[in-house]
A protein has these predicted regions:
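Short, well-ordered beta-strand elements
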Residues: 27-39, 57-62, 151-155, 286
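Short, polar/charged alpha-helical segment
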Residues: 38-57, 169
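Pocket-flanking alpha-helical
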Residues: 44, 62-100, 194-198, 214-219
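Ligand-binding pocket segment of bilobal, Venus flytrap-like solute-binding proteins
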Residues: 71-72, 79-82, 155-237
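Ligand-binding "clamshell"
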Residues: 91-105, 202, 216-254
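A conserved helix-loop-strand patch within extracytoplasmic ligand-binding domains
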Residues: 101-156
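A bilobed periplasmic-binding-protein/Venus flytrap-type ligand-binding module shared by bacterial periplasmic
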Residues: 114-124, 262-278, 301-302
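Conserved small/polar residues in nucleotide/adenosyl-binding loops
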Residues: 329-330
Length: 330
């Protein structure tokens, strides 16, 4: 079976080596690590489909939260990660690279954002433009936390995601912890549901969120200003974040904080997998795999609105729209 050398994806392209394999035995087993948020799931589904149908691989997927999945990746238990939020785990990721546990395979999604958001109607009505504007009792009451009387609620990351601890530290540095809880919604789906449900009911929203996502194209959220991203400050803050992750919230020490950086999302492979000659074509494919943020957003919107929650159908839809589906089945 032949596979095209280069296929254009909007303004980016995926280079795919020719495939001589027609059976799982020719490729062998590939163990992908996946996370509990939709954009990672889309990439895992697309890559998994190509590996199975195009390269003849036997694909296994293990899905979970950031810390355990990345730990398993560093421990050579998971071969490939297709969406790494590198700056959120920068210390342990760089240590893993330096120790020769993984190799980085370049950029997947060129641009992503994350931060604190308020729904536009509330932001406009009360003049909420920055995190400092949130530090008023009358504003906190708009976002009342039913489980913490006297405080507002900011719906945050899930506790197994590093951004939950980053947000915890930011709350303390910015003084938001006096007015708001850093609420763990329990899952990425519950976070989406909390935001979408509030919009449907016309209720105020104060939440952490990010792009690329399908939901962001459906709701009108305003990102609050924070101190501008500063690499030196971020490094200091992340040292505190890692201490808290290891030893608990009481390990917090005074630090600075800044906005999340506009981040390029990356890919990586375990060195055990990457160093096998038989895996070279797979590693070359993953290295070349890159999807622009708008295409990711469109795929996520399809997943949410048209696929019936079927991630494989979403992958096939994406591949069909880019001309790749027919090539895979040549």
């Amino acid at each position: 079976m032949k596979f095209l050398k280069k296929i254009f994806l909007s303004i980016a392209f995926i280079a795919v080596a020719s495939i001589g394999a027609t059976s799982a035995n020719a490729c062998g087993k590939v163990h992908l690590g996946d996370f509990d948020w939709d954009s990672a799931n889309v990439h895992t589904a697309i890559v998994g489909y190509i590996l199975e149908k195009g390269y003849g691989c036997q694909v296994e997927v293990t899905k979970g939260r950031t810390s355990p999945i990345m730990a398993a990746h560093y421990d050579q238990q998971l071969d490939i990660i297709t969406e790494v939020w590198r700056d959120n785990i920068v210390q342990m990721h760089e240590e893993a690279v330096a120790a020769g546990k993984i190799i980085e395979l370049g950029i997947n999604t060129p641009s992503s954002t994350q931060g604190f958001y308020v729904d536009k109607p509330t932001a406009d009505k009360y003049g909420l433009k920055s995190v400092d504007d949130m530090k008023k009792p009358e504003i906190a009451k708009l976002f009342a936390d039913p489980e913490a009387p006297g405080k507002g609620r900011m719906t945050s990351c899930i506790s197994g995601w590093t951004c939950y601890t980053i947000n915890l530290v930011k709350h303390k540095v910015y003084g938001l912890d006096e007015y708001y809880t850093n609420f763990d919604p329990g899952s990425g789906g519950a976070l989406d549901a909390a935001i979408a449900g509030a919009f449907k009911k016309g209720k105020p929203v104060f939440s952490y969120y990010w792009t690329p996502t399908g939901l962001m194209g459906k709701v009108d959220l305003v990102q609050l200003e924070e101190p501008a991203y500063d690499n030196e400050c971020w490094t200091k803050m992340m040292a505190v974040v890692e201490k808290i992750k290891a030893d608990g919230p009481d390990a917090y020490t005074d630090t600075c904080a800044s906005a999340y950086v506009n981040m390029a999302l990356t890919k990586s492979a375990s060195t055990t997998f990457a160093n096998k000659k038989s895996n070279k074509k797979i590693v070359d494919f993953i290295r070349a795999y890159s999807v622009p943020t708008p295409d990711v957003n469109r795929s996520l919107a399809f997943y949410m609105d048209e696929s019936g929650g079927d991630m494989e159908a979403t992958a096939k839809h994406f591949l069909s729209n880019t001309g790749m589906l027919s090539l895979i089945h040549i």
